[in-house]
Amino acid sequence: MLIEDENIRYGGAQADVEDDAARKAQERELKKAEVRKRMEEAAKKGSKKKGFLTPERKKKLRKLLMMKAAEDLKQQQMLKEQERQKTLQQRTIPLPDVDSINDQGQLLKIYEDMFARVCALEEEKFDINFGVSQTEAEINQLTIQVNDLRGKFVKPTLKKVSKYDNKFKSSGEVKEKSNFRNNLKVVKKETDLDEIMAKKKGTADGKPEWSKKEKKEEEAAPVELAAPVEPEAEPEPEAAEPAAEEPEAEEEEEEEEEEE
């Protein structure tokens, strides 16, 4: 009875809501299917636009081309080697068996033939070398003319110099020190001290005049005091008399000036 009640579907508002939800879900699925179909079609169109050569096919084609080029190169090398062997066979003469020949005339003939062939080959070699040297000289002249027209000169062959030579040269050279004082003008400055020192040097004893005068007065005073005591006075030097008279003359002049 309970199972039958569960399977019974009642009408009304709830049934309409369930129908709308089912319909919306179905529409959503249809839209998804349409979008998926469009994307697949677009992917197919895009793959068609890329062309026939996909990256994998390009890689295979590149590999095949490399293999074909290697085979062609080997074949060309084989052909060149065959041509070389063919030309060598044509130009070289098979040597006769000299050991088995006892006839001297036949041996002499073989010698003359070989000598003539060697001479001919040497002449051809000289002609070829001469032609090559002439062409090289012409090429050099043309290159010089072209460089002259361009305004450029051929670079000379530079001599290889060790890097240590330059280092030793730079270390050996001593830089001259610039002394700016030598360029200055020398000006002689005379001060009062210099004048005084010059006057001192000009005197005989290197002492000022006023010190000489005081010394002369001191020498004259003890001589006058000692004159009555000593029976025989020592003769005074002639230079002392004018020295003693000088201060007296100066005192008289000062007194006259004061009186005036």
UniProtKB/Swiss-Prot annotation:
Where are the stretches annotated Disordered?
A: 192-260
Q: Where does this protein have compositionally biased stretches of type Basic and acidic residues?
A: 192-219
Drop me one GO molecular function for this one: troponin C binding
Q: In which tissues is it expressed?
A: Expressed in body wall muscle from first larval stage to adult. In adults expression is predominantly in vulval and anal muscles, body wall muscle expression is weaker. Also expressed in vulval muscles of hermaphrodites and the sex muscles of males.
Is Nucleotidyltransferase among this UniProt entry's keywords? Answer: no
**Assigned GO CC terms:** myofibril; sarcomere; troponin complex
Q: Which UniProt keywords apply?
A: Actin-binding, Muscle protein
Disruption-associated phenotype: Worms exhibit abnormal muscle morphology, egg laying defects and constipation.
Please cite one Gene Ontology biological process associated with this protein.
post-embryonic body morphogenesis
- From start to end residue, where is composition biased (Acidic residues)? 231-260
Q: Which one Pfam family would you cite for this protein?
A: Troponin
What the record says about family reads:
Belongs to the troponin I family.
Function recorded in the entry: Troponin I is the inhibitory subunit of troponin, the thin filament regulatory complex which confers calcium-sensitivity to muscle actomyosin ATPase activity.
Protein name per UniProt = Troponin I 3
Q: Which species does this protein come from? A: Caenorhabditis elegans
Gene this chain is encoded by: tni-3
